[in-house]
């Protein structure tokens, strides 16, 4: 297992990571996987990222058919923490999608919900046309590797269009933001940190500019989501 973890953590880019995952899972007769994540941005916006080795025609058909709206496994994963094994009876709202996915080799699978402490929500699925491949060994392998996969993708993608760059705050800005996070006004904070109220407002304004937020509440939410500060 350490060898597999090392190959994930030393991947040089996303394509290299896909190659390493394909090799690892391929050794267990699992040719398909999909990592899909919704990433919080500033101003309560989100961005979706998908990294997958799925049949391309199926992905195109899935998107064109808007199956994302009826995908029972996806909806389960966004609202639960425990993995789910694909069975026909769980696809009550998406039976047509289920039958079509079987035809392209996505018959047997397990999906693992992703709910990160930094606010990301998503899913990691493994799939195979071979029923015996999706077994206890594959389950334990994926359960073990998933935290490393998620952190590696965050590391690789942090500086591109998906993950927002987290601006650095000064020690004073961090101090003032922490007081703001627990509900202190600029005046109250000025009394606590022994600064003029206008100086506190100045620092809060700089924080909002750095985070590209339009108000103090958004700046606090962004900082908490991305672990810039902790309560």
Which residues make up each language-model segment?
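GAF sensory/regulatory domain recognition
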Residues: 37-61
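Regulatory sensory and allosteric helical modules in signal-transduction proteins
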Residues: 53-102
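Short hydrophobic beta-strand micro-motif common in sensory/regulatory domains
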Residues: 108-114
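Sensory-domain boundary capping and coupling elements
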Residues: 115-128
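Regulatory loop-to-helix N-cap segments in sensory/regulatory domains
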Residues: 128-139
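Regulatory hinge/linker segments at domain boundaries
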Residues: 155-175
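Short alpha-helical "packing" element that flanks the helix-turn-helix/winged-helix DNA-binding module
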Residues: 173-180, 219
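Recognition helix of helix-turn-helix DNA-binding domains
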Residues: 185-218
């Amino acid at each position: 297992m350490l060898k597999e973890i090392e190959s994930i953590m030393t991947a040089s880019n996303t394509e290299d990571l896909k190659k390493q995952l394909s090799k690892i899972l391929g050794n267990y007769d699992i040719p398909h996987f999909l990592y899909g994540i919704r990433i919080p941005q500033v101003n309560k916006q989100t961005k979706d990222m998908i990294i997958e080795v799925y049949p391309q025609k199926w992905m195109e058909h899935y998107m064109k058919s808007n199956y994302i709206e009826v995908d029972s496994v996806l909806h389960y994963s966004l609202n639960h923490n425990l993995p789910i094994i694909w069975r026909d009876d769980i696809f009550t709202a998406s039976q047509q999608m289920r039958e079509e996915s079987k035809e392209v080799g996505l018959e047997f699978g397990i999906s693992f919900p992703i709910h990160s402490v930094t606010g990301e929500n998503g899913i990691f699925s493994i799939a195979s046309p071979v029923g015996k491949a999706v077994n206890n060994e594959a389950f334990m392998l994926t359960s073990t590797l998933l935290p490393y996969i998620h952190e590696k993708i965050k590391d690789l993608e942090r500086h591109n269009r998906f993950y927002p760059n987290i601006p650095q705050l000064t020690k004073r800005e961090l101090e003032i933001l922490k007081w703001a996070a627990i509900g202190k006004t600029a005046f109250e904070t000025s009394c606590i940190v022994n600064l003029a109220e206008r100086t506190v407002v100045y620092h809060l304004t700089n924080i909002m500019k750095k985070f590209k937020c339009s108000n103090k509440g958004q700046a606090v939410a962004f900082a908490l989501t991305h672990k810039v500060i902790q309560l």
